[in-house]
């Protein structure tokens, strides 16, 4: 049977990502932490660590080329996805992980400590109440809300020319039809996942 490490290495190759051995180890340790805490905290419906490699790690890392440093916010981070895998792979970028569920932010804070991630801040807050000291160059979300809500809830967090990235499964045609802003749909191919994945990208211009 394939190991988590083998699946991760193959997936990283397919995504064209080159990570150090310590970074790969951190990613696998993150899966172990989710597995350990999942019983008590109900962090994810995925129970199999091997499935987590594709559905959580590789799915998160598929958007890495589209993330604009240096300040990134992960809205509705849940179990720390996609924020923690990306933070492991982008150590020079600062990540702020936000969720309104205190159980989940407790887990994410613990994961940050155990994985020794110095570039991650965890906030227990509703998105609309967030007042960051510095605006973000990228705001991203995964399975958070419909596109209109995401846009309305996060625009105040974006710096001029900052980008909003919304991770979706099938292209949400109806949601996109209701938007009064320009957007780009980026198809994603995630190793180990047959289902469709896409990324919706929007940019905040100086007048928007």
Q: Each PLM stretch: what is its role?
A:
Residues 1-69, 73, 103-106, 110-120:
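Class I SAM-dependent transferase core
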Residues 21, 123-125, 187:
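Short loop/edge segments at beta-strand edges and connector loops
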Residues 34, 86, 168, 202:
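Residue-level signal for inorganic ion chemistry
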Residues 58-141, 151:
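Conserved SAM/SAH cofactor-binding pocket of Class I
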Residues 96, 170-208:
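Active-site capping/gating segments
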Residues 104-106, 147, 172:
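Short alpha-helix immediately C-terminal to the canonical SAM-binding loop
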Residues 151-161:
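A short glycine-rich, Lys/Arg-flanked "PGG" loop and its adjoining helix->strand segment in the class I
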Residues 161-171:
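Conserved beta-strand signature within the Rossmann-like core of class I S-adenosyl-L-methionine
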